[in-house]
Amino acid sequence: MIKIKKGLDLPIAGAPVQTIQDGPAIHHVALLGEEYVGMRPSMLVQEGDQVKKGQALFEDKKNPGVLFTAPASGKISAINRGERRVLQSVVIEVEGDEQIPFEHYAAEELNQLSDEQVQHHLLTSGLWTALRTRPFSKTPVPGSRPRAIFISAMDTQPLAADPQVIIATESEAFNHGLTVLTRLTDGKVHVCHAAGQAVTRHTNTQVTYNEFSGPHPAGLVGTHIHFLEPVSQTKMVWHVGYQDVIAIGKLFTRGELCTDRIVALAGPQVNQPILLRTRLGASLSELTAGKLKEGDNRIISGSVLSGTAFSATHGYLGRFHQQVSVIREGREKELFGWVMPGRDKYSITRTTLGHFFKRKLFAFSTDMHGGERAMVPIGNYERVMPLDILATHLLRDLLAGDTDSAQALGCLELDEEDLALCTFVCPGKYEYGPVLRDILTQIEQEG
């Protein structure tokens, strides 16, 4: 077992009850282009076209053969583009349940499949896009092979669902998915889970189980990779979400593309935080209708630490998100708030009275409690960074744009979510995730 000591479990109110309910009917779904790092689409459909679930919507020009398929059948109601014609979202108005059939196999045949067969099946169905590389967090190049594949069967994000509750409903499909993944690598398939949890073991010795304990980010895949298979420019691993492993298992044994998604709808502004069964790319406004408290709320696809805020073109459940978080917009001003004791304010540096109430849960809002200022190294970053990385030095070099030093300090091991806690505790109010992405892009382009 690997025990994480540094980190932070955010004491936020509104944790979900770990019970699964059917969500409301979803009439609009979308595939979000900006979730795929470096992707340039070659469109195969246009507005007004009728599509079936599993039908290809566009192909990646930079990664020929990588298809992005429809998560539902219906009509293409909108193709939204941003600056420089960057694809933001392809919106589908759901109609019917027609789907593209795929070849399927008996469970005992999965171990005999070649890697070419597995890759072809994943590419044509669109499930190849569920895989991501580390470093760079990109969709893998077809034909490549990773040193290892990681599945995080635990989640320490604030307000997250318990993955074991979800996996237990589809344990057979999950194990079939693991079998398929072993055909894609000569190394290990790492399943990382919380310490003390009873996990059904796969019979294939290529699948290994690793226990992690401790505060967030103990459940992040970046933490698991750092301790088990550290990456570099010459060593690449892949990772995939546990619900996508279930979808892979169903694809190969049933011949159908599963786009079901169980998400945690939670946060201080949710009336009854719970787990909802919905579909990939679901409209967040439809998913949360009638379930939120009155007021000016911010709906977030993903975690409050690293998710994507609701907007007109991005108001849909993200491809890699397992939760929908709702907090209050912090628009109000507080007179002399900086001199008040702050019983209802959380602080990691003991500057408010709320720090001394260890079991208190706080109704966090979007208020930053101050504006941007100089980066102040007072030890906050080291408190929440469990990786063997000099956090302050790395963040300083990221802000300075020093790619050589940032690479030497370990930035290739990181993704935006790995620096989310550093952003949260930063006295200077810096957003380190976008800065890291710019540096990673520059490193990749420079080779």
Swiss-Prot record:
UniProt keyword annotation of Secreted present: no
Protein name: Na(+)-translocating NADH-quinone reductase subunit A
GO terms under biological process: sodium ion transport
Known partners and oligomeric status: Composed of six subunits; NqrA, NqrB, NqrC, NqrD, NqrE and NqrF.
Enzyme Commission number, as recorded: 7.2.1.1
Disulfide topology: none
An example molecular function term from Gene Ontology annotations: oxidoreductase activity, acting on NAD(P)H, quinone or similar compound as acceptor
InterPro entries: NqrA, NQRA_2nd, NqrA_C_domain, NQRA_N
Catalysed reaction equations from the record: a ubiquinone + n Na(+)(in) + NADH + H(+) = a ubiquinol + n Na(+)(out) + NAD(+)
Pfam families: NQRA_2nd, NQRA_N, NQRA_SLBB
Family: Belongs to the NqrA family.
NCBIfam families recorded: nqrA, PRK05352.1-2, PRK05352.1-4
Enzyme class: translocase
Record keywords, A-Z: Ion transport, NAD, Sodium, Sodium transport, Translocase, Transport, Ubiquinone
Its biological purpose: NQR complex catalyzes the reduction of ubiquinone-1 to ubiquinol by two successive reactions, coupled with the transport of Na(+) ions from the cytoplasm to the periplasm. NqrA to NqrE are probably involved in the second step, the conversion of ubisemiquinone to ubiquinol.
